[in-house]
Design a protein with these regions (language model features):
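A structural signal for short, well-ordered beta-strand segments
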Residues: 1-3, 166
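Active-site ligand-binding patch in enzyme domains
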Residues: 3-7, 11-144, 152-155
C-alpha cells in the first residue's frame, strides 16, 4: 500500500482535495513502484476524485530507471479497480490511457473497450470480497500489487490481512484535524 500524507497524518483536505501533497521526487518514485508491480489496485472513489489513470509515465520515471531500461521495454501494469456500485463509466481518463483494466464489481454492466475486463465478485457483509479478488489475481500470476487508494479501501485491506508492505511518503505540510486520515479501521 502506497500512501502520501502530511506531517499530521492526513491524506487530503476535508473537501477531498489531495493532489500533489508530496514532492516531485516522491511522484517520480511512485512511477518506479508502478513499473515494477504486476498490478495497481485502486477504488472507484479514488479514480473519480483524482481523475487517475494509474499508468507508468516514462517522462516521470527517475533518471536511474530510464538509464537502465529502454523506453520500448516499458510495461503497463494491470489496473484493478474496485467498483462495487458500478459508478465508473468508459469516458473517464482511466479508460482512455494505454494498458489493461480489470473492473472488480458485484454486477457486470454496459459496454466497455476491449482492454477493459469486468470481474464479478461476491459480496461479504455488503462489500466486495477482497480476499476472493486477491485469490483470482494470484490465479492469473499477478502476485505484486501496488495499492493506490483512499482510507476506506486501504483500511479494508489492512483489516483483512492483505497488506505486506506500507510505503509512506510524508510531506512537510499540515492539513489539520478536519483532513482525511490514512485508514478507516473498525
Amino acid at each position: 500500500v502506497k500512501l502520501g500524507a502530511s506531517l499530521d497524518g492526513r491524506t487530503a483536505m476535508a473537501s477531498g482535495d489531495s493532489q500533489w501533497i508530496t514532492s516531485p521526487e516522491a511522484r517520480r518514485d511512485v512511477q518506479r513502484l508502478r513499473a515494477r508491480h504486476d498490478a495497481v489496485l485502486s477504488s472507484a472513489e479514488t479514480v473519480l476524485a483524482d481523475g487517475a489513470s494509474l499508468t507508468v509515465r516514462w517522462d516521470e520515471l527517475p533518471a536511474s530507471v530510464k538509464a537502465s531500461y529502454p523506453k520500448e521495454t516499458l510495461r503497463q501494469p494491470l489496473r484493478v479497480i474496485v467498483d462495487s456500485q458500478n459508478r465508473l463509466t468508459p469516458d473517464l481518463p482511466l479508460f482512455q490511457s494505454e494498458g489493461p483494466v480489470l473492473l472488480a464489481r458485484h454486477k457486470v454492466d454496459g459496454e466497455w473497450p476491449a482492454w477493459v475486463q469486468q470481474l464479478t465478485l461476491p459480496l461479504l457483509d455488503g462489500k466486495l470480497d477482497l480476499v476472493s479478488l486477491f485469490m483470482l489475481l494470484a490465479k492469473q500470476n499477478i502476485n505484486s500489487v501496488l495499492v493506490e487508494a483512499g482510507p476506506r479501501l486501504c483500511g479494508a485491506l489492512l483489516e483483512k490481512g492483505l497488506v505486506d508492505e506500507l510505503v509512506l511518503y510524508q510531506a512537510p505540510k499540515l492539513l489539520g484535524d478536519e483532513g482525511r486520515g490514512l485508514f478507516h479501521l473498525p
